[in-house]
């Protein structure tokens, strides 16, 4: 992979169902660990990929309860048939075609230009959020090879100009015929640093991105917990 700015450095639950109202928002096996000096244009960490001002984004009200879940969503009933990891709850968005798990004690919140988001009660940097953009592609493989896709996302979409980005690991999984790229990366400034997992997939003419992360100082403690979240993203047929 020849990129001029790249230097190589080895190295019991409560289901949540989405019910939405339209509002106007005011505003992917690792071949090498990559140390990137970001040159992409961004307002803040990952802000370039969060662009969406002037588009119609959706704010949701969460309805909690197995009865509601079964009554409103067939894909959700299938999710219930699976073993939900202890201390996690499933989020199912039948309308937009995706689902994932999040820690049961996290709270829902609004994250600009994202379709859904949950965060730790006390640590704001410890959160998960999902967004999607339109695409004519049918699978993440059509976007490109995993190494190229991950590099482009981290360098050009996630990192701000004042951040150094490091890609630690990446992997691919196939589930129900759908391909997913999941990768671990860090963003660092002189003031603070974060580490995250991201999972990307394509389906329903949409490019889905899930990001779950935490402050770098807490990463060793919460990495396994957040890995479950990153690996849980599923594309549901609309």
Swiss-Prot record:
Keyword Flavoprotein: no
Entries under InterPro entries matching the protein: Mog1/PsbP_a/b/a-sand, PsbP_C
Bilayer topology term: Peripheral membrane protein
Disruption phenotype: No visible phenotype.
Transmembrane segments: none
Record-level Gene Ontology MF annotations: calcium ion binding
Subcellular location: Plastid, Chloroplast thylakoid membrane
Pfam family, one: PsbP
GO cellular component terms attached to this protein's record: chloroplast; chloroplast thylakoid membrane; extrinsic component of membrane; photosystem II oxygen evolving complex; thylakoid
GO-annotated biological processes: photosynthesis
Keyword Transport assigned: yes
Annotated S-S bridges: none
Keywords: Chloroplast, Membrane, Plastid, Thylakoid, Transit peptide, Transport
Cross-referenced PANTHER family: PHOTOSYNTHETIC NDH SUBUNIT OF LUMENAL LOCATION 1, CHLOROPLASTIC, PTHR31407
Complex formation: Part of the chloroplast NDH complex, composed of a mixture of chloroplast and nucleus encoded subunits. Component of the NDH lumenal subcomplex, at least composed of PnsL1, PnsL2, PnsL3, PnsL4 and PnsL5.
Family membership: Belongs to the PsbP family.
Free-text function comment from the UniProt entry: NDH shuttles electrons from NAD(P)H:plastoquinone, via FMN and iron-sulfur (Fe-S) centers, to quinones in the photosynthetic chain and possibly in a chloroplast respiratory chain. The immediate electron acceptor for the enzyme in this species is believed to be plastoquinone. Couples the redox reaction to proton translocation, and thus conserves the redox energy in a proton gradient. Required for accumulation of the chloroplast NAD(P)H dehydrogenase (NDH) complex.
Protein name according to UniProt: Photosynthetic NDH subunit of lumenal location 1, chloroplastic
Organism: Arabidopsis thaliana
